Amino acid sequence: MAELRSNMITQGIDRAPHRSLLRAAGVKEEDFGKPFIAVCNSYIDIVPGHVHLQEFGKIVKEAIREAGGVPFEFNTIGVDDGIAMGHIGMRYSLPSREIIADSVETVVSAHWFDGMVCIPNCDKITPGMLMAAMRINIPTIFVSGGPMAAGRTSDGRKISLSSVFEGVGAYQAGKINENELQELEQFGCPTCGSCSGMFTANSMNCLSEALGLALPGNGTILATSPERKEFVRKSAAQLMETIRKDIKPRDIVTVKAIDNAFALDMALGGSTNTVLHTLALANEAGVEYSLERINEVAERVPHLAKLAPASDVFIEDLHEAGGVSAALNELSKKEGALHLDALTVTGKTLGETIAGHEVKDYDVIHPLDQPFTEKGGLAVLFGNLAPDGAIIKTGGVQNGITRHEGPAVVFDSQDEALDGIINRKVKEGDVVIIRYEGPKGGPGMPEMLAPTSQIVGMGLGPKVALITDGRFSGASRGLSIGHVSPEAAEGGPLAFVENGDHIIVDIEKRILDVQVPEEEWEKRKANWKGFEPKVKTGYLARYSKLVTSANTGGIMKI
């Protein structure tokens, strides 16, 4: 074991004042000289994925003490993307990731901890803590709060939060009545935990396993299961071993590890937000990773599992089928799909970790020779509409559609788009453009779950494409193309599109183009008046000035 970092505040005559303060915080004489462990929690009452994390913090601290460490718990902020959806609150969601990363870095660096247990769960909390872990680079393990159980209607049909969002669109289209919508509302979110489909939170918690920063089960053991509490205890104890072996996050998160994370993402059809967050993680880890490389991973990794919102299979079903380790083990049977020699938090390789984890239900995790598609569930599109890339969740596209052409229907905000969709300004075959909703323009790159849910609920899901410099909830599905870079607020091509322009989306060829004569296009660019920030004060104003486009992970300029 390396020399303890905490010696900086515990050892020597000149540290008597520091020890005096530590004694006041409950540190005993025999604790000096033991590893000081940061327990980075994200308990918060208003987020259902986090209401139970206070109990998990207690379990972690008990396990740390039993294993010979001294735990110190602190908390981060958190935003519930579902509750923040559809109003100004969503502008704060992605920016909260940076606050979380900064706050964790601040607390841990200021107090010279020797190791860290991160207890995240929902959308921006996990990536924020991951980013901080890369910056601090002390032995760290991730322990998510676990997924919510799927809801069930009175007829036994499994549902989730996305069912409720889509139910609103269905009700407004006259497809269901008020009682049916009320039933979806009552039963869509039956327990604590991260929402029950392969949405952003669960995607990131599963990717933490593939990255090697969490033990098997992190992404799939239900929040309310006794197995989850035992998992929390086991993970905390593992951290003490990781400290003894002096394994740090940057030893684990390499190009190979990020390839593995995206390979899992492709196999499970994870949220498009994983691209944004993993690119930000790579940046903090000092790893160069391009969007083109993501397409290379997609070319060699098949799509093996289709989960909600793309199907009626939920995270609980994935767990029963063997979880992430089983999916990775199945994937490992294809040569070159994974880097099996990648290091994990236990000191074992990924190959050693997943060995023997066989698939228990091939209806949930398809066998390698019977994939949903030969290519992975995410794709990066390029073209004159997205010179620096755009992301689509191919695993969420219905009916195997790979190409769409149609006229643009342009909206300058999500609110404007929602109004237009509800008032039938969008029809079959159209390409909806929602711009000025990127990291700078939004500000905060809000999720477009409400517009996509309206489109699906009104029966237009497979018949309309939606393109935005904003992003999508993991609960979104359909021909939803986000993260268009550079964004409109930066003078990206999306700013110059007009109603009726012919748009081409070709998933197979990875193309996103607009067909406008060059002379006309240059005229539009010359006439563009620039972007006026929507928010002039507070954190969002600072964020808007400092943030970069989605192709960099939406990170802040230094």
UniProtKB/Swiss-Prot annotation:
[2Fe-2S] cluster binds at C122, C195. Its cofactor is [2Fe-2S] cluster; Mg(2+). The active site is at S473 (proton acceptor). Binds 1 [2Fe-2S] cluster per subunit. This cluster acts as a Lewis acid cofactor. GO terms for cellular component: cytosol. One of its GO terms (molecular function) is dihydroxy-acid dehydratase activity. Coiled coil: none annotated. Functions in the biosynthesis of branched-chain amino acids. Catalyzes the dehydration of (2R,3R)-2,3-dihydroxy-3-methylpentanoate (2,3-dihydroxy-3-methylvalerate) into 2-oxo-3-methylpentanoate (2-oxo-3-methylvalerate) and of (2R)-2,3-dihydroxy-3-methylbutanoate (2,3-dihydroxyisovalerate) into 2-oxo-3-methylbutanoate (2-oxoisovalerate), the penultimate precursor to L-isoleucine and L-valine, respectively. Belongs to the IlvD/Edd family. This is Dihydroxy-acid dehydratase. It comes from Bacillus subtilis (strain 168). The gene is ilvD.
